[in-house]
């Protein structure tokens, strides 16, 4: 396997305006906080037609063609974790599961656009990463106006496979322009209604050439603050276009 030099291609990538969460937050508390914050965002304006993620250093903190060795497999009932053949673990960045589950619950299609030279390994990761969708239970448990408590069956958290959250996958070497032209052709969604999260600024060309709203991801990966900021910026662009058309 060819090894890349250094931790990532662009260490100077800026950090996001991340919403700071207490260090001692449990998984459930963090999930609830993110779900509540994003629910407020849902009710405050329009939402994008498609949210697209790069994979390496955007959803997880490594290069799958460099830092892990195939095959990647889940162990037992582990959540948000797979291991390579040497026992090296891979997980999503902390906020990513709750963000992706919110997108799915909100009816916003999700796509992957990655130029990795190891697409099979990337799909092994997405197939092996299982997530717990318990945000709706956490919300109802703290809702004093709720007329009734959930039944025992409803109280069981739902476990979902990460790959099943993606409506579209463009995972292969090449240009992100090629990826997005395919996403546009397959989905019928206008470029200007797409938001793209990626850690490499060179891929901002999808914005200048196609009109996609590009969001550069910093060293912390995709997180709540970055998503909130991205949607607000996308809304501002949308409003400006509408005003210009009057």
Which residues fall in each region the model found?
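Catalytic phosphate/metal-binding cores of nucleic-acid and nucleotide-processing enzymes, i.e., regions
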Residues: 70-75, 89-90, 128-129, 202-205, ...
């Amino acid at each position: 396997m060819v090894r890349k030099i250094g931790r990532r291609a662009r260490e100077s990538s800026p950090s996001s305006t991340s919403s700071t969460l207490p260090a001692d937050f449990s998984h459930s508390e963090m999930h609830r906080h993110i779900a509540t914050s994003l629910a407020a965002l849902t009710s405050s304006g329009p939402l994008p037609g498609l949210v697209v993620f790069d994979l390496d250093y955007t959803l997880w903190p490594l290069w799958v063609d460099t830092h892990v060795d195939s095959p990647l497999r889940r162990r037992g009932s582990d959540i948000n974790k797979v291991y390579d053949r040497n026992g090296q673990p891979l997980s999503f960045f902390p906020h990513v599961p709750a963000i992706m589950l919110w997108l799915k619950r909100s009816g916003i299609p999700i796509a992957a656009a990655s130029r990795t030279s190891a697409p099979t390994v990337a799909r092994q990761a997405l197939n092996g990463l299982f997530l717990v969708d318990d945000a709706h239970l956490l919300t109802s448990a703290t809702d004093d106006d709720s007329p009734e408590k959930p039944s025992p069956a409803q109280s069981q958290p739902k476990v979902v496979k990460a790959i099943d959250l993606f409506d579209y996958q463009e995972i292969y070497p090449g240009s992100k322009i090629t990826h997005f032209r395919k996403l546009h052709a397959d989905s019928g969604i206008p470029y200007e209604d797409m938001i793209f999260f990626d850690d490499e600024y060179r891929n901002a060309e999808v914005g200048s050439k196609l009109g996609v709203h590009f969001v550069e991801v910093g060293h912390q990966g995709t997180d709540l603050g970055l998503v909130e900021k991205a949607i607000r910026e996308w809304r501002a662009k949308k409003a400006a276009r509408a005003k210009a058309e009057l």
